[in-house]
Amino acid sequence: SLSDKDKAAVKLLWSKISKSSDAIGNDALSRMIVVYPQTKTYFAHWPDLSPGSPHVKAHGKTVMGGIALAVSKIDDLRAGLLDLSEQHAYKLRVDPANFKILSHCILVVISMMFPKEFTPEAHVSLDKFLSGVSLALSERYR
């Protein structure tokens, strides 16, 4: 679980990067689709899956909106993300393994866009946070 130090580090990093969250989401989702082509199946209804396409940008923004929600619910991710968990489990039927894949892509993008802010400490705390988000989103799959 997240320590108070981890929570503070995530909130501090988020305060520095949140203005760029749309770009982070677009790049992370674009990377996931290219590097992990099996994830394309969830977006087969989109006419264009190329990096930066309108649908990819829009969903990247949605994903990062979910991350913003998670930051605001950092003290109780399970309860705070319950609606998103239900949506992904019952409506969208997303394999929860994909949450870890997208989390990794988000880490990669943040490390490249914000190398100064992405300290080793911030990396560890953000990785733990995104693991917690993935676990919370997987809650309704059980």
Swiss-Prot record:
GO biological process, one term: hydrogen peroxide catabolic process
A UniProt-annotated Pfam family: Globin
GO molecular function terms attached to this record: haptoglobin binding; heme binding; iron ion binding; organic acid binding; oxygen binding; oxygen carrier activity; peroxidase activity
Modification sites for N-acetylserine: S1
InterPro entries: Globin, Globin-like_sf, Globin/Proto, Hemoglobin_a-typ, Hemoglobin_oxygen_transport, Hemoglobin_pi
Gene3D superfamilies: Globins
UniProt-annotated binding residues for heme b: H88
Binding site for O2: H59
GO cellular component, one term: haptoglobin-hemoglobin complex
UniProt entry tagged with the keyword Metal-binding: yes
Globin domain: residues covered: 1-142
Keyword Lipid metabolism: no
Expressing tissues: Red blood cells.
Coiled coil: none
CDD domains xrefs: Hb-alpha-like
Subunit structure: Hb1 is a heterotetramer of two alpha-1 chains and two beta-1 chains. Hb2 is a heterotetramer of two alpha-2 chains and two beta-1 chains. HbC is a heterotetramer of two alpha-1 chains and two beta-2 chains.
UniProt miscellaneous comment: This fish has three hemoglobins: Hb1, Hb2 and HbC accounting for about 70%, 5% and 25% of the total, respectively. Hb1 has high oxygen affinity and displays strong Bohr, Root and phosphate effects.
Function: Involved in oxygen transport from gills to the various peripheral tissues.
Family that this chain belongs to: Belongs to the globin family.
This protein's name: Hemoglobin subunit alpha 1
Organism this protein belongs to: Eleginops maclovinus
Gene: hba1
